Amino acid sequence: FKMADRPLISQEMSTGYPNNETGHPTRSYQLIHQNPYTLIGYEAYDWADPVSFLKTQAFITGELAETLRRSNDQASGIMHFALMTWFRQTYDYQNIEPYPTYYALKRALQPVLVSAELWGRNLYAGEKLPTRIYIVNDREDGTDLKPSLLHWEIQDETGKCLASGCEKVPAVKHYARHYIEPNIQLPNTLPANKTKTKLVLKLTENGLPISANEYELLLARKEWNAGQVNNSKKIVLLDKDNTKAVFDFLNIKYQPVSSVKELLDSKLKADLCVISGLTTCNDEEKDLLRAYQSKGGKLLFLNNKETAKTVYPEYITGWIIPTEGDIVIMERNDAPVFNDIDVLELRYFNNNKREIPMACTATLKAHRHKNVTELAGQMKIHAYIDGGKPED
């Protein structure tokens, strides 16, 4: 949408509002709009550590600013909203101090910006980091950027270098941008099975630093994931959507079957029956599954919203297809399924594509009942704006 010779403006280039004292979300944002809940779940409320909201607000604010500068070649400027929410105690000059968002914008608004296009933040050790590195030249003096050198490092939380490399960058004209696709190989060896790291970028021109940036990444060994599976237990898999590729990638042992009847065969002596991608289920199969579960059998439904509703209609009434689906929040962070997983780690998975990677493809609508434990959820941000119903 364009109008010749007329500027376009946007109301509230906003990413949320921490209060000026603790850093928790402002009350109206927290309790009426409920947007903080969609981002960080129960960490949004006053009993939680405000660091979760401050960290998330800094992330989305910085990412939004960098994304616009990487992609919009016709923007003359961006007015981010609102400055007073990026600091603690803005009304007291003796005690004012910046929140994390200030530092995120300080990096994002450098005149010469080195910026990584990262879609996923949770990755496996030894894999190639799928990214484009952009150089945006908005120098205040209007000069072109000469051929430069990009230095990259993967660092652990102590700043120790785990992997590094350099890439040449061609000249970039003023008011232009250029990207490269460097070969960044994530380290094979990590200090722990799951390690918090940073991608650190430094751009130099004629040996002098002109831009720097950093991005948090969560790296894990495949053994960390597979280690949650008890190999002494027998897993039987009915696979209709190639979930076996995931199991094979993680070296999880399983026995494949081709039907519900075969899956539930007592001769297999399964400890866990996994059903993945089964979109239809007849009455006989439904009765078999319910009978198996009622006798103590363990079933895991993956990507089967239709089958789950068919088998348990008294509990599951339908589903919602999320418009985003990149963030899932924990309803029960004390559940064993979340052992060794932090509350902000059910998001920004990696699928090696230039698209928002989904953490969920559907949200089941369930009755509140003593037989139902909701482990995790997903809620659309600003769901009320386009006519959404409160119950949805």
Where do the PLM segments sit?
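Substrate-binding clefts and catalytic carboxylate motifs of secreted carbohydrate-active enzymes
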Residues: K2-S164
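Beta-strand-rich binding/interaction modules
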Residues: K128-A171, R177-N183, P187, N193-E205, ...
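Aromatic-Pro/Gly-enriched surface loop or interdomain linker
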Residues: K196, L208-L272, N303-E306, E314-I327, ...
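Extracellular/periplasmic ectodomains of large secreted or surface enzymes and adhesion receptors
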Residues: Y103, R107, V114-Y124, G165-K173, ...
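Short, well-ordered secondary-structure micro-motifs within conserved domains or adaptor modules
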Residues: F1, L263-D283, K298-L300
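Short, Gly/Ser/Thr-enriched beta-strand-loop segments that form substrate-interacting elements
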Residues: E374-E391
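Loop/turn elements at helix/coil->beta-strand transitions in domains of secreted/extracellular proteins
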Residues: A4-P7, S71-I78, S232-K233, L268-D271, ...
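A glycine-rich, often tryptophan-bearing local segment used as a flexible ligand/cofactor-contacting loop or short
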Residues: T279-L364
